[in-house]
């Protein structure tokens, strides 16, 4: 439902909405996150899709782009180089999409050699070693998610067939209790929020939930900080 907002953002930035109309001076328009797992609806408007987890792959892409700026490469040559180097980057302009008669995708073919096919989703192996923003901007006004949010586990053990995230975020990767406590204390010290949300696709499946809650209560009850579970299965 937010696809039109993406186009509006590009237009407000005074960047040509159609990727094919962007010239040498235009910035790259990159999309990622959960919705990028199905990129074709936005393929005409996005230069590069970063498929999968971005904590490690996005900084790598940025460093490659910075290095290319020192070379005399055209915009298209840079896109080709990124798509050939990073196995989780999808550049729609470099692929041909073949459809069945019912408009479902039959095949995605690279237009040039050296491109990954299929494109693999990036996956962070250890959440404890990835960057986590512990100094988020605190708004002047009250927002809907007016709290600290910490992802305690990525992936889900349930395997519900209807759930995109549960199927695409495999395998399950939990943070350690120590890492969660450390992040919670840093975020609290930097924001002063009075609520901490422990986020996961199914928080009740976190393997060390009892010990985590004991530690969180010990540290944060004296500070009058609430702990919330935003995703609980109804049968648990």
At which residue positions do the language-model features occur?
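Conserved beta-strand positions
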Residues: 31, 51, 165, 198-200, ...
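Active-site lining segments that contact anionic ligands and/or coordinate catalytic metals
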Residues: 86, 127, 145-149, 157, ...
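Glycine-rich beta-alpha loop elements in corrinoid/cobalamin-binding modules
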Residues: 1-110
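N-terminal [4Fe-4S]-dependent radical SAM core
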Residues: 92, 98, 102-149
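Conserved, mostly hydrophobic/aromatic
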Residues: 47, 156, 160, 180, ...
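Iron-sulfur (Fe-S) cluster-binding segments and ferredoxin-like electron-carrier domains
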Residues: 163-179
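Conserved SAM/AdoMet-binding glycine-rich loop
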Residues: 186-236
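N-terminal pre-triad scaffold of radical SAM enzymes
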Residues: 138-161, 188
């Amino acid at each position: 439902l937010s696809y039109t907002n993406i186009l509006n953002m590009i237009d407000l930035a005074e960047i040509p909405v159609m990727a094919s109309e962007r010239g040498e001076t235009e910035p790259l328009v990159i999309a990622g996150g959960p919705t990028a797992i199905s990129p074709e609806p936005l393929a005409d408007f996005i230069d590069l899709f970063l498929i999968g987890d971005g904590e490690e792959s996005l900084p790598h892409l940025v460093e490659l782009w910075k290095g290319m700026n020192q070379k005399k490469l055209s915009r298209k040559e840079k896109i080709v180089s990124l798509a050939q180097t990073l196995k989780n980057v999808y550049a729609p302009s470099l692929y041909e999409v073949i459809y069945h008669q019912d408009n479902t995708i039959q095949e995605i073919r690279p237009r040039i050699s050296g491109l990954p096919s299929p494109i693999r989703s990036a996956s962070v192996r250890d959440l404890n070693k990835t960057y986590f923003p512990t100094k988020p901007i605190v708004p002047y006004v009250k927002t809907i998610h007016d709290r600290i949010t910490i992802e305690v586990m990525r992936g889900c053990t349930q395997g519900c067939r209807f759930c995109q995230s549960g199927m695409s975020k495999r395998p399950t990767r939990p943070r350690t209790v120590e890492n969660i406590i450390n992040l919670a204390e840093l975020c609290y010290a930097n924001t002063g929020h009075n609520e901490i949300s422990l986020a996961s696709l199914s928080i009740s499946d976190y393997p060390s939930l009892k010990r985590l809650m004991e530690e969180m209560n010990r540290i944060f009850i004296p500070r009058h900080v609430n702990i919330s579970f935003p995703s609980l299965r109804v049968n648990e």
